[in-house]
């Protein structure tokens, strides 16, 4: 087979030819391959690969979104685009970036183009209105590409005339930094870190390499400490009333939000009434990532600090649009409608130093709610764990335990951890206490910060580490060398425990590295057995599935794999991911962030040990192996912890989840509940219901799981359904 770069060039030419005359039929695909072959003189093997790859890429599809609207929509976006060919410069270079650099399927890009136009239509034309306040919610799937979606919306909004774009990017600095980098690549086109350091190096990245002439500014950077600071904003000296759009990516942090409000009010605000400031003629788009986390008001008698600050920021602008994004809308379902919330929180103001700002209405998405289906190559809980029928209500035990009715799309990529037993498993309290005292239990469900910590890793975690080494080596055999590889270890929320486990993993990894370097026969035999019994059959099973990238999952022989074991294990690093800089009392001092960007040229292979920082939003690049024993009783928390969902092009067959059988059962139940909720949403769409009717039924899991945190869950009503699916009186 030819060099990979030549095949990538051939693939790009074919896709460009197919874009000229859509749709991409099989005859058109063959014709494009023939034309490219005349130019590049490819081998028969190359032609066969190119044809298969094009069929796979063009075959990736995505259904249309379902939208609940408050009012009849009067489209304005298409007319705006048609006024001037240059009106979509931000979007056009982002579209080309997705196609050429990210290799996103044409149909998926086309759906994104349509969807972002539809969202903008439901906001407001910033040039045609003197005042507006629009609210909406976009519901996706965990790790399904929500960031790509809202970066696309940002580009369209900037093209349409929105001048200030604020992105609320979770509650942790690592997630904010990662989100800023995605904005740098997809919208700004330059590295916000090197641009601040006045580096002489070319700092163009992402879309900037496609069209560097499109200008936008940022008041924040992708550095871990690059959140909004008043001093930095003043030093950057960007004209907020200029022609170029400005983006600000911040954490959901009360003090940061207050500082931003104060600075914007003083910088571009005008006096309005007796004690109020207002910002005129600068349209604001506020993107709320993970809109169910921290943004929800959790106080019944007052307004939560972050919720109030977000509402005050929106209220500061005469022209504002709010769009929330989430994969777990369980809490958003129970936000009270505007009329009720207005009575609850009338006249409340946000105090910032010696100033105060009026708090606007709650974040209920009154204009629209959009449910986005994932692309056909997305691996979600229904494919990972299996559900029986997403549109029906089943007996709980039958749904969770009977896989006999499951279809062939279920991947079965999980392995039950059998050497893990919660203390509660033991009926005899004396036995349970003996287990705790003698440290026989690796991570008890209800362990405390100061409990005795494990002295060694359980066999299941040692096997997971071996699987990670094998996965890294196999990707190298497939030519995926300078790429990121990640393993997730999520077993505790306590920082001291995370560091202790990281230290145990570092020691174990050193032993594995030495055994591979010196060719330990027993260790290599162990690796070969795992490869032959587990990985080879799974590759054969998945490689025939075209909709998940199976054509790129070429079988790897042990002979070739063995040669890549040492290069693979040598690259692996261990990171304790929690963000604490206090080293006192910690075993492992390797508390660096998972620095993918700094290792972008050669790729980072990392075992990330963490807790809450790995639970929501943060993407682990090239994730193959997950070891997950963290118990939670909330639907939204468990789903967000599922970092293993998403896209694994060319290496899905190498992915594994090690977890307890209880957690597998919980995920199966939540998969059913979530798909039922989405089916109910689709039913409401067919009936032309409005967002205010978004009080969906969500299947409860009596006595074991709860839907969301109790303080987000006040406006609920419990119902009971019989086997017929009809409501029963209780």
Describe every region a protein language model picked out:
Residues 101-137:
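Conserved pre-motif I regulatory segment
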Residues 388-528, 532-536, 543-549, 645, ...:
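C-terminal helicase lobe and adjacent C-terminal extensions/tails of nucleic-acid helicase motors
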Residues 217-282, 296-313, 611:
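Conserved RecA-like ASCE ATPase "motif II neighborhood" in helicase/translocase motors
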Residues 578-665:
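Conserved RecA-like P-loop NTPase helicase motor core
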Residues 164-188, 192-194, 200-203, 493:
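Conserved Walker A/P-loop ATP-binding site and its immediately adjacent core
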Residues 149, 153:
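Hydrophobic positions on the alpha1 helix immediately C-terminal to the Walker A/P-loop
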Residues 192-222, 270, 277-291, 434, ...:
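Conserved C-terminal RecA-like helicase domain
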Residues 194-204, 282-288, 298-458, 463-474, ...:
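Conserved P-loop NTPase catalytic core
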């Amino acid at each position: 087979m030819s060099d990979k770069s030549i095949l990538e060039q051939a693939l790009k030419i074919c896709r460009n030819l197919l874009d000229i005359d859509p749709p991409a039929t099989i005859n058109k695909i063959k014709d494009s391959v023939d034309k490219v072959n005349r130019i590049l003189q490819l081998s028969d093997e190359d032609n066969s690969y190119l044809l298969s790859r094009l069929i796979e890429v063009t075959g990736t599809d995505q259904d249309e979104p379902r939208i609940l609207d408050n009012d009849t929509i009067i489209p304005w976006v298409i007319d705006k685009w048609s006024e001037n060919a240059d009106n979509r410069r931000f979007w056009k270079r982002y579209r080309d970036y997705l196609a050429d650099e990210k290799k996103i399927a044409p149909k998926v890009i086309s759906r994104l183009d349509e969807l972002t136009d539809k969202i903008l239509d439901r906001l407001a034309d910033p040039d045609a209105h003197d005042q507006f306040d629009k609210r909406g919610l976009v519901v996706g799937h965990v790790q399904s590409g929500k960031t790509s979606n809202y970066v696309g919306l940002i580009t369209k909004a900037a093209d349409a005339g929105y001048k200030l774009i604020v992105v609320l990017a979770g509650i942790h600095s690592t997630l904010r930094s990662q989100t800023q980098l995605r904005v740098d690549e997809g919208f700004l086109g330059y590295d916000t870190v090197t641009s601040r350091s006045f580096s002489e190096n070319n700092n163009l990245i992402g879309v900037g390499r496609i069209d560097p002439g499109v200008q936008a500014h940022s008041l924040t950077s992708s550095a871990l400490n690059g959140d909004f600071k008043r001093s930095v904003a003043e030093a950057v000296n960007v004209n907020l009333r200029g022609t170029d759009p400005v983006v600000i990516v911040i954490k959901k942090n009360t003090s940061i939000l207050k500082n931003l409000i104060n600075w914007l009010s003083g910088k571009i605000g005008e006096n309005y009434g007796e004690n109020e400031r207002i910002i005129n003629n600068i349209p604001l788009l506020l993107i709320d990532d993970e809109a169910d986390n921290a943004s929800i008001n959790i106080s019944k008698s007052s307004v939560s600090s972050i919720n109030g600050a977000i509402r005050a920021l929106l209220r500061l602008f005469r022209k504002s649009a709010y769009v929330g994004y989430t994969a777990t809308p369980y809490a958003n379902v129970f936000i009270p409608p505007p009329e009720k919330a207005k009575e609850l929180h009338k006249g409340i103001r946000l105090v910032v130093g010696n100033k105060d700002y009026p708090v606007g209405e709650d974040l209920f998405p009154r204009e629209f709610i959009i449910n986005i289906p994932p692309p056909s190559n997305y691996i979600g809980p229904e494919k990972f764990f299996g559900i029986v029928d997403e549109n029906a209500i089943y007996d709980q035990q039958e749904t969770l335990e009977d896989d006999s009715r499951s279809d062939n799309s279920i991947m079965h990529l999980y392995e039950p951890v059998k050497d893990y037993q919660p203390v509660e498993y033991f009926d005899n309290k004396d036995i349970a206490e003996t287990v705790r005292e003698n440290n026989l239990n690796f991570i008890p469900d209800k362990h405390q910060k100061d409990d005795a910590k494990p002295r060694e890793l359980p066999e299941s975690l040692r096997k997971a580490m071996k699987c990670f080494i094998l996965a890294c080596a196999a990707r190298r055999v497939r030519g995926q060398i300078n790429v990121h590889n990640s393993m997730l270890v999520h077993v505790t929320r306590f920082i001291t425990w995370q560091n202790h486990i990281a230290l145990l993993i570092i020691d174990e990894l050193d032993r594995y590295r030495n055994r591979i370097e010196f060719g330990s026969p027993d260790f290599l035999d162990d690796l070969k057995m795992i490869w032959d019994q587990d990985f080879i059959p799974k590759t054969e099973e998945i490689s025939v599935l075209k909709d998940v990238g199976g054509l790129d999952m070429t079988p790897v022989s042990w002979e070739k794999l063995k040669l890549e074991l040492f290069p693979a294990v040598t690259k692996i690093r261990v990171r304790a991911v929690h963000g604490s800089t206090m080293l006192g009392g910690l075993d492992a001092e390797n508390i660096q962030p998972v620095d993918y960007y700094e290792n972008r040229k050669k790729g980072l292979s990392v075992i990330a040990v963490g807790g809450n920082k790995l639970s929501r939003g943060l993407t682990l690049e090239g994730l193959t192996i997950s070891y997950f024993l963290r118990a939670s009783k909330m639907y939204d928390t468990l789903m967000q912890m599922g970092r293993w969902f998403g896209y694994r092009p060319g290496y899905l067959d190498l992915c594994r989840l090690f977890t307890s059988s209880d957690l597998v059962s919980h995920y199966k139940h939540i998969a059913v509940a979530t798909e039922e909720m989405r089916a109910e949403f689709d039913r409401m769409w067919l009936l032309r219901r409005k967002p205010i009717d978004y009080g969906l039924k969500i299947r409860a899991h009596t006595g074991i799981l709860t839907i969301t945190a109790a303080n987000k869950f006040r406006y609920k009503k419990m119902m009971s359904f019989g086997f017929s699916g009809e409501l029963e009186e209780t």
